[in-house]
Regions:
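Terminal membrane-proximal soluble interaction domains of membrane-associated proteins
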Residues: 1-87
Length: 87
C-alpha cells in the first residue's frame, strides 16, 4: 500500500524495483519504484518513486492485488474479508 494520490488515501501498489543511483542521489535517500495500477484496467497506472518507509507491505499475492483492483475493490484478497464502510 502507498498513500496515493494524496496523504490519507491508500492505493494498491506493486513494488517493481529501484530507480537507480541518479534518482537516489538527487533525492538524498534510498527509494523504490512502485507501480500503482488504475481500476478497472490495471495495464495503465502511475509509476511513483517513494522511500521504503512510505510503503506498507501486504501479505497477498500479485494475483490477489490485481483481482482487488480489477473488481474495483469488491473482491478482497484471499483469506481476508472487507468490512462495511462506517456511516
Amino acid at each position: 500500500l502507498v498513500e496515493f494520490p494524496q496523504r490519507g488515501h491508500w492505493s494498491i501498489g506493486l513494488v517493481v524495483g529501484e530507480p537507480g543511483d541518479v534518482i537516489e542521489q538527487a533525492l538524498g535517500e534510498p527509494v523504490m519504484t512502485v507501480f500503482v495500477p488504475t481500476a478497472p484496467n490495471p495495464t495503465s497506472g502511475y509509476t511513483i518513486i517513494v522511500p521504503p518507509r512510505e510503503v506498507k507491505e501486504l501479505d497477498i499475492t500479485v494475483d490477489d492485488a490485481l483481482k482487488f483492483v480489477i473488481s474495483l475493490g469488491v473482491v478482497a484478497p484471499t483469506g481476508h474479508r472487507l468490512g462495511r464502510p462506517s456511516a
